[in-house]
Every structure is written in C-alpha cells, then in structure tokens.
C-alpha cells in the first residue's frame, strides 16, 4: 500500500442544503466547514458551480470563494470549477485576479466545460454551446489574461494581469485529460460523480503530459466521495444520505440533504440501485482504518498525487468529524 503521509487532502464543496434550511444557514455551515478544514491542515477548499439546482447553493462561485477566503487563514480556496463556456474569459480573469490580489498565494482556478445545469438553464445563462467546442482556445486566452502583459493585445485584465493564478483543468473524460496533458496543466478528475473513465483518463494524462512553464511533471488530483465515521457500520449508515441525494438527481427531484436511513430497501428499484452505485463507484466509506486502507490502494493503483473529497453528510457535526478522521490519516 502507498504511504499517505505526503499526500495532500482537499475538499470540494457544493454547499448542500436541507429542505427547510435557509440559504443563509447553508452558507454559514459551509464557512464553518471550511474553517474546520483550515484548522486541520487541509490543502484546498474548492467551490463548485451549479445553477438552478434546489439543494445546492454554489451558483455564485467567485463570490463564495472570496467570502470563505476572508473567513479562513491558510487553506487555498478556489473554483472546482468555473464552467468556462458560461463566462467570458476576461470576466473570469478580472474576478480571479481580484481574488488573488485580496488573498495572495491562496487562490486556485479550476476550469471545466460542462454547463453545470440543464439545457434550459444553460440558455438562461446565455451559454453558447459552440463555445464549449473552443474550450482550448478560451483556456489559452485566460492564461494570457492572467499572465504578464506582452504588449500585443488591446484588452488587458486589470486586475488579473500578471497574477498568474494557478489554472487547473477539470474533467471526467479522455478529452479533458488529453488537453491538460497538452497544456502542461495540473489535472483534477471528477471521480466523485463520473468514475467510469478514471483509469484511462489518468493514464492518458500521464503518458501524454508535456512540461510547461507552470508544471514540469504531471500532477493528478482525484475527486472522491468520502464518508468517514467512528466505525464501518456508522459510516455505511451515514452514507445513505448521499445515496438518497443521487437517487433524487436521477429522478429529477430536488437535491435536498436527507436524514440517513437504516436501509435503502424500498426506496429504490433494482435498476436505480445499480445506477446510484455506479455513480458513487469510487466512494470511500468506513471507519479510520478502512478509509486509510482504501485511499492507500487507490493512490497506488491510480498514481494519485492529491485527493479532493466531497462529503455529503446530513449533519454538519458529522461532516466535521469526518474531517478530523481524515486529518488523523493525513498526519
């Protein structure tokens, strides 16, 4: 098994919401969660971008990044990620250049090309699907806007210029892996919801990686769903919250956090069970020893440099306790 002592642990936050909770309460919980991660020595705290999804309140990603960075001390805070075809590269450069100026050395910019929502909402965002086909060009444009001014463009990101905010490429496909390799950028694979191509994508990225000004060797961060508790049995019980959430997603229902249940039997069909389990195929669920063993095996098998975890538990206290367990493994 691989040693985890030198493997950074990070968090991906979607600001999950209970049905009768206010947005203010949910966001306050995300801040408390981030502060716990900060005190425990986690490496990054990234906010996702999702629109028009009841039960998830991370639509204004850059606003939340600024708020959380201001409430924490050391942890890197960033986007996991900005769906670039939803936004003009200049606006993204200005936003993240501002964040980097406010919180120097603590801001990350992860980029994806998915809508982050359904087709109707995409149209409301004025998203042009053809822009997704030019994702490579827009990443290059954004890199130029955040880099030093070279005197050959009438458009400059002020603030943003020469902040060199670290850019990551996010994805769950061979395309994203290949593009990250070609550009010499760090790569984050979305194993927390799309584990199907994880082995092929990481292998492709490492095989085709081309050193760049920002990275001399490949760097892989893997997203995983995590449920860590005092015992394996308690973790399996708490994991039913995430299972109910994914079941709701597949049924087109709101994604409220639901209380854990003793059994999922009767809540899903056999086909739905298979679909949910495939979705959560890389889930790491268990007590400290089980979690440590599973993470060590995944690191060794997939050659992972860093883990970034989703942690969809019903109670904030359980989410915080999961972080304490992870920190004990990390340290």
Show which residues each predicted segment covers.
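N-terminal beta1-alpha1-beta2 module of alpha/beta enzyme domains
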Residues: 1-71
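Acidic (Asp/Glu)-rich catalytic clusters
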Residues: 2-4, 38, 65-73, 100-107, ...
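Flexible, glycine-rich active-site loops centered on histidine and acidic residues
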Residues: 4-23, 85-148, 187
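Conserved, mostly hydrophobic/aromatic
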Residues: 9, 37, 41, 49, ...
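Hydrophobic faces of well-ordered beta-strands that scaffold small-molecule active sites
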Residues: 9-13, 45-47, 77-79, 107-111, ...
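Active-site mouth loops of central-metabolism enzymes
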Residues: 13-28, 82-90, 161-171, 279-288
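An alpha-helical appendage that flanks or caps ligand/catalytic pockets
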Residues: 129-156, 197-304
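A conserved active-site cap/scaffold subdomain adjacent to cofactor or substrate pockets
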Residues: 177-196, 202
